[in-house]
């Protein structure tokens, strides 16, 4: 393995604050695998902001926020955004200044356990 790849793969220390934004819309059937994949990350230092723009995801998002209050926030704006872009922009306005780095997740993503660590290392190069 090349030295640059070895360093990325072996370093599990994260000292930066990372905010992961997830804007969901009628994503009830996708949310659990997505959130579980973030919870399975091999580094800490992240906080997940879950926001929904539809009816079926709110109870699931709240369940996760209640279970993992130190890692997950269920943000309820009370607004309908009409597009993922507007929803994410609103989340950036509300939370963007609270972290060193921001990552975005779609509701139907499933992240590899090393995604946060490897992405952060690449961003810092």
Each model region followed by its residue ranges:
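Nucleotide-sugar donor-binding/catalytic module of glycosyltransferases
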Residues: 5-125
């Amino acid at each position: 393995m090349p030295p640059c790849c070895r360093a990325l793969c072996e370093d599990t220390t994260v000292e930066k604050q990372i905010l992961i934004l997830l804007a969901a819309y009628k994503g009830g059937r996708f949310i659990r695998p997505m959130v579980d994949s973030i919870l399975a990350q091999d580094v800490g230092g992240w906080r997940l902001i879950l926001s929904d723009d539809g009816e079926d995801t709110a109870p699931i998002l709240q369940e996760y926020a209640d279970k993992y209050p130190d890692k997950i926030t269920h943000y309820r704006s009370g607004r309908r955004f009409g597009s993922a872009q507007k929803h994410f922009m609103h989340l950036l306005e509300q939370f963007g200044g609270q972290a060193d780095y921001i990552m975005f997740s779609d509701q139907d993503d499933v992240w590899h356990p090393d995604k946060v660590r490897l992405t952060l290392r690449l961003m810092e190069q």
